[in-house]
C-alpha cells in the first residue's frame, strides 16, 4: 500500500478565515493540539485549536517568516531582524539573537528543527530582487553561517532520514521552458 493511502481526502474547509496576505509555515503543536502559522506581509501570528474552534491572532513587531514551538513552552519566531521568543499568554517578544543587521532589506523566511534540536533557517531579500539570503543554523545560543549563499528564497528545509543531508528549495536558478 503506498504511503498515505489510508488518509481520507476531503474538500478543503475554511476553519479560520483570517484572510492572510501571505500565510506560511503551518506547524502542529501536539501538546497544545494547536495549529500555528504566520502571515508574513500582515505581520501576524495565528493559532487555531480544532477541538474547540478557538482561533487567536497576535501582531508581530516585524515580518514573521516562521514560528516553531520551544520545549518548556512558548514559541520561537523568525522575525525580520532575528530570532525572538514569543509568549502567547502576554503577546510579548524577546530578542534571542539578531541576524543580518547589515542587510536591513533582508528577512527570515523558512525554518526547521533537526532531531538534535538544531534550528536551520534561511534569509532572503524581502523585495526578491537580490540574491542576498543565506542559510543558517542555531544551536545552544550560537548562530552559525553554513556558507550556503547566495540564496534567493529558502523554502521547505528538510533533513534526509540519516540526518546528514539538508535539502531546501532555493529559487536561485530559473529556466525558460520554451528554450530548445
Regions inferred by a protein language model and the residue ranges of each:
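Residue position within the beta-strands of beta-propeller blades
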Residues: 37, 77, 121-122, 168
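Short loop/turn segments that connect beta-strands within beta-propeller blades
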Residues: 49-52, 88-91, 138-141
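Conserved small/polar residues in nucleotide/adenosyl-binding loops
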Residues: 173-178
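A short helix->beta-strand "capping" segment at the edge of beta-propeller domains
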Residues: 2-19
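Short, solvent-exposed loop/turn segments at conserved positions within beta-propeller repeat blades
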Residues: 40-41, 127-132, 171-172
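Beta-rich, blade/repeat-based domains predominating
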Residues: 18-32, 60-75, 79, 102-118, ...
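A short beta-strand motif characteristic of beta-propeller blades
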Residues: 12-16, 53-58, 94-100, 143-148
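A short loop-to-beta-strand structural motif that recurs across blades of beta-propeller domains
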Residues: 44-46, 82, 134-136
